[in-house]
Amino acid sequence: MNKTITPSLETIERNWFLVDAKNKTLGRLATEIATLLRGKNKPTFTPHLDTGDFVIVVNAEKVEVTGKKASQKLYRRHSGRPGGMKIEKFESLKERIPERIIEQAVKGMLPHNSLGRQQFKKLKVYKGADHPHAAQNPVLLNS
């Protein structure tokens, strides 16, 4: 009988990937990023361990959505105080904080527990084409 090999935290290799969000559909891009963050693309994937890679996303302000979502999709946040609900459309959030759009889409695709929070910390999103992670030699993903 074969034994399942569980990787230890010392043996897990973490790579850095660079994803360009220019002219990409939001949901398809977020799915791809969430897969890399969880480590589901690796043969050593283990559901209860953080086996994922680091992902750098550039050109967040150039991400697209299909149909009328640009004018109809709403983003909600609450200050925690009575009457503190703020509602913002995709268009205005894209102008103000485009990084938050991708972060929120990916965060919803990760586990909703401490493991998901740990995996989410490996996502780095930047508005323009520049990023401060050149020393990590990220691999460009063409998809």
Curated annotation (Swiss-Prot):
GO CC, any one term: cytosolic large ribosomal subunit
Instruction: Enumerate the CDD domains for this protein.
Output: Ribosomal_L13
For this UniProt entry, the molecular function terms from Gene Ontology, in alphabetical order, are: mRNA binding; structural constituent of ribosome
Q: Which residues form a coiled coil?
A: none
**Which InterPro entries does the protein's record reference?**
Ribosomal_uL13, Ribosomal_uL13_bac-type, Ribosomal_uL13_CS, Ribosomal_uL13_sf
Alphabetized UniProt keyword annotations: Ribonucleoprotein, Ribosomal protein
Q: Which GO terms describe its biological process?
A: negative regulation of translation; translation
List the Gene3D superfamilies.
Ribosomal protein L13
Q: Where is the signal peptide?
A: none
The record's listing under HAMAP family reads: Ribosomal_uL13
* Subunit text: Part of the 50S ribosomal subunit.
Q: What does this protein do?
A: This protein is one of the early assembly proteins of the 50S ribosomal subunit, although it is not seen to bind rRNA by itself. It is important during the early stages of 50S assembly.
Family label: Belongs to the universal ribosomal protein uL13 family.
* Name assigned to this protein: Large ribosomal subunit protein uL13
- What is the organism field in this record? Prochlorococcus marinus (strain MIT 9215)
Q: What is the lineage of its organism?
A: Bacteria, Bacillati, Cyanobacteriota, Cyanophyceae, Synechococcales
Gene name, Swiss-Prot/TrEMBL: rplM
